[in-house]
C-alpha cells in the first residue's frame, strides 16, 4: 500500500472518534440520511435521520455549553448567517398562511428546517475541529449510505421481478406501520409489469438523483488513485454497481443531471477518459446492461420509447408546472405562500394529493417568493465559491508537490460536478429540500476548511 492511501490524514495513530457520542451520532446521521422510508408521524414526519440529528444537536450543544466554547470558523459563521436569513424569510412567510392545513404544513417544514440547517452549521463546526481522517469517514458514511440504498433497491427489484414479493413488507412496514413498496411504472404487453426500484428513498427519481452524488464525487478520486492502491478495484466495482442501479431507476431527471455533471468533470479529466481505468469499468456497465436488454429486447424497447417520448402531450405536464409561478407571484410576490406549502398549492391547482410533475425551483418561488429565491441563489453561489477555494487549495498543493493534491483537487471537482448535476436534475423534480442536500452542502463547504488549515506551501 502506498503512503498516499485514502484516507490521507494527519497522524496514523489519531483516534478515529475523538468524542464517541458526538462523532458517532454525526456519522450515523449521515449514513442514514437517504433512508426516507424509515420514518414516523409524530409532531412532524420524522425520519430515522431526523431523530439521530435531534440527538446529535442536543449532545453537540450540551458539550459546547459545558466547555463554554462558542468559537466558530468563518465558514460556520456564514452558514449560521444563512440559517438566520432563511429563518427570517420563513417567519415573514408565516403571515401569508390562510388555512389550518397551510399552518400544519408550515410547522412541519419549520421543524425540518431547524434540524437540517442546524446540522449543516454544527456539522461544519465539528469537521473543522477533527482530523482529515474524520472527513474521509464522513464522506464514506454519506456515499456508503447511498450505496446501501442502491443495494436495497437491487434486492427489491429482483424479488419483485422473480417472485412478485414486496421487500418493504418484510423489513420496513413492521418498523414504521406504513405500507410501502417498489414502484410499478406500468405494464408491457398486458402481462409484464415494469418495476422501478425506489429502495429506501420512496421514489425512483429520488434514488436516481441521489445516486448522482457518489457517482460524480467518487469518479475523479478513483481516476487519480495510484496504480496498485488498495481502494482502486473496490471503487471501480462500486462505481459500476451505482451506474447500473442509476440506469435501473429510469429517471430522466437523474440522467440529465448526470450528463451535465459528467461534462463538468470532462473538462479537467478528459485525458483520463481514454485510459483503461475509465474504459474498463464503463465497458463492464455497457456489457452488463446490453446483455440484460438483449435478453428482453421487446420489453425494454417499449419502456425506452415511453421514457423518451418528447411529444407535446408527454412534455407539457413537466413544463406546465412552471405556470404556477406567475399566479403565485401576482398575489404573494416577495415571500410566497409559506414554507412547505407547495404541496397544498399543488393539490389545490391540480386536484392531486400525490405529486405529479413538479420542480424544486417552482416550489422555491411558490413557498418563499422572490426574496427566498434570491437568498437561495446566494446560498448556492456560496457553495460554488467554497468549492472554488477547495480547487485552489488543490492547485497550490500540486505546485508544492504535496501528495494530498491527488485527493483534494479531485474531491473538489467531484463536489462541483455533483452540485451542478443536482441543480439541473431539480429542474423537473424536487429533491433539494431533502435532508441529504444539507449533508452534501456541509461536506462541500467544509472541504477547504479541513484541507486548507495546515501549512503545506513553499
Label the model's feature ranges.
Residues 151, 157-163, 247-249, 266-310, ...:
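A membrane-periplasm/extracellular boundary helix in multi-pass inner-membrane enzymes
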Residues 118-122, 136-269, 381, 385-392, ...:
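Alpha-helical transmembrane segments of multi-pass inner-membrane proteins
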Residues 20-40, 53-122, 291-292, 422:
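N-terminal hydrophobic segments of proteins, predominantly signal-anchor/transmembrane helices
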Residues 195, 299-368, 389-395:
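Long extracytoplasmic/lumenal interhelical loops at the membrane interface
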Residues 25-31, 233-242, 388-428, 444:
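Loop-to-helix entry and N-terminal half of a specific, functionally important transmembrane alpha helix
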Residues 27, 32, 54-60, 259-262, ...:
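Transmembrane alpha-helices of multi-pass inner-membrane enzymes
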Residues 1-23, 396-409, 426, 430, ...:
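A juxtamembrane structural motif centered on a specific transmembrane helix
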Residues 199, 203-205, 243, 323-326, ...:
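A conserved mid-to-late transmembrane alpha helix and its immediate loop/hinge
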